């Protein structure tokens, strides 16, 4: 059982355990020790988003890693997928991301990429914890002449911009397109506008003035209403919203209607099927994806495989099965032909390329999928116990499942990063499933709720 690492690295409130400088330094030391392999000089890339606490955690990690005789390449604020990309392109031994993704600025997190740009497997995270909690790491100290150095990589943003532009078809550009772009005052505030402008688009930017405390605050992929209003106001072709570390993207079409991750997957999967580019004709999604996605992909001659929630599990399934497209309803898209992890801007470019090639608007493309009505209710809990061990709750859930039959589904799971139980229902009748979801949520709240 892991004590520090959750579904997406170590996460918590900045300057409160485990997100302290002391723990960050220990994590850096343990990771550096594990990534060393042989007698050569080793290098680890460190990047971050725009949170104020990024400075303190970055310096603690640099100190910890250097103290183990490993050099550090500091890239500064850069999208999470950009850090993965730079890690593999610079042939570093690992990459570290300091970010809490879409969470508020008070939180921060630390996660790792292996040398090939993929997230670490659970076993490696357990080894890092074991070294820290057994105190073994305390006695491992290279002599003074063997400690590491830290270097700043000044052109990391430029390198990533070039990489992204190279994923867009050479024969196409974005001339004449008006795009509203929301960078959530996060890590993509320089990269994303540059990519779209260099490809010829007229960009109307929002959320590009980070101050350390405004990341995700009223902007970004969790607030599509910002780009929705802006698209209508500016009569733009579409809106693109990234989250704080730019590993996910949400769109709105030319009418200001939201186009979520399921629709993006449907658009990309059906286009790739048409051009015979979808490996094994299979899309990998999670159990949170709408049944409408399965129907759309099946109709186009493909199939959908479902995994647990979390882009790391999507990637694991993709690598295991040899698939090249996967994603989540929340907007994480993984195009393994191009990158190793969820990449908001890369996904946006793939959708823009389909729009350009087909001559269709985003609303026309989004018609490929008709979602079943879906309701999601979150309940704050005091403990994460197996919900089916509470007899009244289990009986209510089974009763609802019987009523839904094959016309819908119910999915109940705990958040990997917060004390929340997520209750999701899908069915033909929105009012009916809303009532059932509320009924289950109220009962859970009564039993294990925490205000």
Swiss-Prot record:
GO terms for molecular function: magnesium ion binding; phosphoglucosamine mutase activity; phosphomannomutase activity. Activated by phosphorylation. Its EC number is 5.4.2.10. One of its GO terms (biological process) is UDP-N-acetylglucosamine biosynthetic process. The active site is at 101 (phosphoserine intermediate). The modification Phosphoserine is found at residue 101. Transmembrane segments: none annotated. Binds 1 Mg(2+) ion per subunit. Its cofactor is Mg(2+). It comes from the Bacteria. Mg(2+) binds at residues 101, 243, 245, 247. NCBIfam families: glmM (TIGR01455), PRK10887.1 (NF008139). Catalyzes the conversion of glucosamine-6-phosphate to glucosamine-1-phosphate. This is Phosphoglucosamine mutase. It comes from Geobacter metallireducens (strain ATCC 53774 / DSM 7210 / GS-15).
